Amino acid sequence: MTNANMARSSILVALLLAVATGVVAQEKVHTVEFYSPAVERTMKYNIVLPEAYEASDERYPVLYLLHGLTSNYTAWSRQGAAFYAGLAGDLIVVMPDGGNSWYVNWAENEKGQRNDWEDHIVKDVVGHVDGNYRTIARREGRAITGLSMGGYGGLTLGLRNPDLFVSIGSTSGALSYARRNAAEARGEVAPRARRERTAEEQAGLEARQARINPNIGIESFSSQAERTPAGRAFATAEGADAYDPFKLVLQVPHEDLPHIYLDSGTEDRLIGDARAFAQVLFENDVPFDFMQMPGGHNGTYWTQSLGHIVSIQYEVMRRALGERPVRRSRRP
C-alpha cells in the first residue's frame, strides 16, 4: 500500500470510528424548519456552514445532498457531512427531506395531498437557502448529489434543471426507477410480482409504517406511512419518460450539461444502473467521472463515497467560479 493510500485509509478509519461513537461535530449541523408551498407542509433540512461563516461577509457555494428511500434529512449527517464539509472549508452543505417521494412532482394525488417534490427541492429548498444564507446564488455555485433514491433524484433534478446546478451526481443510485415505470406502463415488462402477506405480516407492516421516528420531528410527516405519498408518481409512460435520466441526458444540449459524477460499490445490486448510465454517457461523448469501489448498499460505503463527492463537486464549483470563492475576511 502506498503512503497516500495508507493516509486515506487512516482518515476513513478515524471517521468511521467517530461516526460510530457519535463524536463527529454535530454542533456544526443546524436544523432549519420552513414552509414549503410545493408540498403544502412545514418541512426541515439540515445545513452545515463553514467555520468562518459568522466572521465573514463572503458568499459560499452549496452542495445539496439527497437521502434515500425510507430515510430522511438526518441521514447524511450520520455519514460525516460536517467532517467532509470542514475539510473543504469554504462550502455550505444542505441536506433536505424528500420523504419517500422519489423527488418527482406526482401526477396524481390522494388524501388531499400536494406532492410536488421536485419543486420542493429546486424551488422551495434552494429558494429558502439562498434567501437566508450567504450563498453564491447562481449555477456555478450549486451542486447536487444523492444516495440510492437520492442518487436518482440528484441526476434527474439536475438534468431537468441544468440552469441551477453546475455539478450533479449519484452514489448507489436507483437510476432505473422511471425507466422501469415507463416499461411497465407500455407493457414491455411485467409489473413486479409482490408476495402475498399473511394477515399477521400485514398488521406488523402497518404497525411499523405507522411508528413515529422522533429524530425526524416533522408534524404529520415522521412515520413511513405519513412520508409515503398517496397517489401515483407517473400516470403515463410519457410522464415517466420525463423523469428518466437515461433520456434526459440526451435531451440537454452538450454545452448546457452539468458535470456528472457517478459511483457505486462493487457489491451493490444497483451497480448495474450506474454502469448502464455510464455506458450511455460514454457512447454519446458526455464527459463524466465514474468510480467503482469495494462496498455494498450501506452506510459504511456512503461514508467513504461522501469524501469523494465533496472533494470532486467542490472542485468543479471552485473552477466554475474561476477562483477560490472565499477569502476568509473577518469583520472588524
Predicted regions and their residues:
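Bacterial N-terminal signal peptides that target proteins for export
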Residues: M1-L12
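N-terminal signal peptide c-region/cleavage motif recognized by signal peptidases
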Residues: A20-T21
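Non-catalytic cap/lid and distal C-terminal segments of serine-dependent acyl enzymes
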Residues: Q26-P332
